[in-house]
C-alpha cells in the first residue's frame, strides 16, 4: 500500500497482527520484497507485526528522476580527496522517511532492523528517535 510519509509517497507492506513491531529496512537499490519471505513469516508466527517499505527512489516509492543519477564513482573520489559532495538526499532524510511511515501508521515503538545501507538508515532512526 502507498502511504504519505515525510511528504513522500512510500510503498509499505504491513504484515502480522498487533504485536510488537519490527521494521525491516533494505539496503541500497533493494526493494522491500528482497527480505526473505521465510524471515517475515517466522517473525509473524512469533507474534510480531512486520513493517517493510521501499526507500525513496526505489521500487514503488516516489522517484526523484528529476534530480538525475549521481556518478557514485566520481562522488566517492571527491569525498576521498576532501571535495564537497551534494547528494540529492541523505541517510538522515531516509531515516525521517522511516519515522514518517511509523507516524502515519500510528506506531510509537518498534524494533529496527536494517540490511547493508538499511543498517545505516536504522542507526539514524535510532539517533533521531531513541
Regions found by a protein language model. Give the residues of each.
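Conserved HGGG/HGGXW glycine-rich cap/lid loop of the alpha/beta-hydrolase fold
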Residues: 6-80
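Conserved hydrolase catalytic core segment
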Residues: 108-130
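Conserved acidic catalytic loop of the alpha/beta-hydrolase fold
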Residues: 79-110
Amino acid at each position: 500500500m502507498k502511504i504519505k510519509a515525510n511528504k513522500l509517497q512510500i510503498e509499505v507492506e504491513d504484515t502480522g497482527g498487533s504485536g510488537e513491531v519490527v521494521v525491516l529496512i533494505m539496503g541500497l537499490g533493494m526493494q522491500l520484497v528482497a527480505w526473505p519471505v521465510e524471515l517475515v513469516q517466522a517473525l509473524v508466527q512469533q507474534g510480531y507485526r512486520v513493517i517493510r517499505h521501499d526507500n525513496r527512489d526505489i521500487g514503488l516509492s516516489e522517484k526523484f528522476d528529476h534530480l538525475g543519477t549521481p556518478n557514485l564513482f566520481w562522488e566517492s573520489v571527491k569525498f576521498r580527496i576532501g571535495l564537497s559532495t551534494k547528494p540529492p538526499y541523505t541517510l538522515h532524510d531516509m531515516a525521517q522517511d522511516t519515522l514518517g511511515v511509523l507516524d502515519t501508521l500510528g506506531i510509537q515503538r518498534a524494533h529496527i532492523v536494517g540490511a547493508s545501507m538499511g543498517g545505516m538508515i536504522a542507526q539514524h532512526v535510532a539517533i533521531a528517535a531513541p
